[in-house]
């Protein structure tokens, strides 16, 4: 929502995810985003993992605005590094036999619920990182079940600049016998 500004303003992404998860805010940004989504005004579907990191960073109060590309995910990673015990979170995985899709909406809902119960921000940040890593590894496992010659994985894109995520995904995939390149 909002073109380039939407990619910078993590709060906008958060409002979009929360609206889609059925959590409706009453502040002006949430109302504007909900109306834009409902009426399909200046909205583009994003499959960017970076935008999800932006939304979670805003949700946890870590970073609400990207002054430079990747700022919110970097700050979220820094927060996660403080964790001693990751909060257990996971993606809902939708697999129809042709495509595998990670549905982050239950994850967003669970983070909101955990925050309302006093969960520690750094533990939620680390839990989010672990959930993303688990989703990537599980996707690869499912793809290999469809084609047992699938044993090499290339990790690329800005999200894999995240050291926590990269190290965990490599660890999980190598433990499952994949050759991993990054």
What spans do the regions from the language model cover?
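Beta-strand segments within the central parallel beta-sheet cores of soluble alpha/beta enzyme folds
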Residues: 1, 70, 152-155
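Phosphate/diphosphate-binding loops
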Residues: 1-21, 35, 182
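Glycine- and other small-residue-rich loops at beta-strand/loop junctions that grip anionic moieties
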Residues: 3, 125, 129, 158
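A contiguous, well-structured pocket-lining segment that forms one wall/lid of small-molecule binding clefts
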Residues: 21-27, 31-150, 164-178
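Glycine-rich beta-strand-to-loop/alpha-helix junction loops that act as flexible
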Residues: 49, 153-160
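Short beta-strands and strand-loop turn motifs
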Residues: 150-156, 181-182
């Amino acid at each position: 929502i909002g073109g380039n500004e939407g990619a910078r303003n993590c709060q906008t992404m958060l409002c979009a995810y929360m609206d889609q998860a059925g959590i409706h805010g009453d502040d002006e940004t949430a109302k504007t985003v909900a109306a834009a989504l409902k009426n399909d005004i200046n909205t583009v579907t994003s499959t960017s993992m970076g935008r999800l990191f932006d939304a979670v960073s805003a949700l946890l109060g870590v970073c609400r605005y990207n002054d430079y590309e990747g700022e919110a995910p970097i700050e979220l990673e820094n927060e996660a590094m403080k964790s001693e015990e990751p909060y257990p979170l996971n993606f809902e995985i939708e697999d129809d036999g042709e495509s595998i899709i990670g549905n982050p909406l239950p994850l967003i809902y669970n983070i909101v619920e955990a925050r309302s119960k006093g969960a520690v921000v750094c533990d939620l940040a680390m839990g989010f990182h672990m959930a993303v890593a688990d989703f990537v590894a599980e996707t690869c496992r499912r793809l290999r079940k469809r084609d047992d010659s699938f044993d090499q994985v290339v990790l690329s894109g800005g999200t894999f600049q995240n050291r926590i995520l990269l190290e965990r995904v490599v660890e999980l995939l190598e433990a499952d016998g994949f050759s991993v390149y990054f």
